[in-house]
Swiss-Prot record:
Function, in words: Part of a heterotetrameric complex that catalyzes the two-step biosynthesis of anthranilate, an intermediate in the biosynthesis of L-tryptophan. In the first step, the glutamine-binding beta subunit (TrpG) of anthranilate synthase (AS) provides the glutamine amidotransferase activity which generates ammonia as a substrate that, along with chorismate, is used in the second step, catalyzed by the large alpha subunit of AS (TrpE) to produce anthranilate. In the absence of TrpG, TrpE can synthesize anthranilate directly from chorismate and high concentrations of ammonia.
SUPFAM superfamilies, per database record: Class I glutamine amidotransferase-like (SSF52317)
Subunit structure: Heterotetramer consisting of two non-identical subunits: a beta subunit (TrpG) and a large alpha subunit (TrpE).
Tagged with keyword Lyase: yes
Binding site for L-glutamine: 59-61, 93, 139-140
Residue intervals of the Glutamine amidotransferase type-1 domain: 2-201
Name assigned to this protein: Anthranilate synthase component 2
Keywords attached to this entry: Amino-acid biosynthesis, Aromatic amino acid biosynthesis, Glutamine amidotransferase, Lyase, Tryptophan biosynthesis
GO cellular component: cytosol
UniProt-listed GO biological process terms: L-tryptophan biosynthetic process
E.C. designation(s): 4.1.3.27
Reactions catalysed, as given in the entry: chorismate + L-glutamine = anthranilate + pyruvate + L-glutamate + H(+)
Active site: 89, 182, 184
The species this protein was found in: Leptospira biflexa
């Protein structure tokens, strides 16, 4: 299996690389795990590399700004049929903007905040416990009323600050999912299970 982590210049990318590497080793099959920054290679190069899975990392800034999101937007627009794509934090916000939704400033910025979520139990959430606590580092959120019909909400904050805020999105016809929180953080319960679901799907 050949997996790409597209790095949006985020400090969590190393955590992501480590955990995904462990998951790939569990499979006991040959694999290649690459990390490429969002301005390091042109989209056509990434497309021709024929990755089996692509993860779009967290990062600073707004996903509508190419200076922050780079080639990530092209990947979401062009590669969602094959291969499957998972967007994390900025990656999920990019999902919302690329497909026509809005990403706006949250009422309360979250920097290292644990929150419980409710989820639909499908896709990357398959087999995960309801009410798990997840780690949040974000000041932007997807605006629900703006989301296109192509996207469905898969998870929300279930209690506390930011209750009801969107924590997961899935494209209805493309193999694209996103989570607003950080499954690669040690503070997120069952985060490795979520990433394993994506890799093994």
């Amino acid at each position: 299996m050949k997996v790409l982590i597209l790095d949006n210049y985020d400090s969590f990318t190393f955590n992501l690389y480590q955990i995904v590497g462990e998951i790939l080793e569990e499979r006991e099959k040959p694999f290649q795990l690459d990390v490429i920054r969002n301005d390091e290679k042109p989209f056509e190069w990434i497309k021709s590399a024929n990755y089996d899975k692509i993860i779009i990392s967290p990062g600073p800034g707004h996903p509508a700004d190419p200076a922050y999101f780079g080639v990530s937007a092209d990947i979401l627009k062009e590669l969602g049929k094959t291969p499957p794509v998972l967007g994390i934090c900025l990656g999920m916000q990019g999902m919302a903007t690329v497909f026509g939704g809005e990403v706006v400033r949250a009422n309360i910025a979250m920097h290292g905040k644990l929150s419980p979520i409710e989820h639909d139990g499908k896709g990357v959430f398959s087999g995960l416990t309801q009410g798990i606590e997840i780690m949040r580092y974000h000041s932007l959120v997807a605006k629900e009323i703006s989301l296109p019909n192509d996207l469905e909400i898969t998870a929300r904050v279930s209690a506390g600050e930011g209750k009801g805020e969107i924590m997961g999105l899935r494209h209805k016809s493309l193999k694209i999912e996103g989570v607003q929180f950080h499954p690669e953080s040690f503070g997120s319960e069952e985060g490795k299970c979520l990433l394993r679901n994506f890799i093994n799907s």
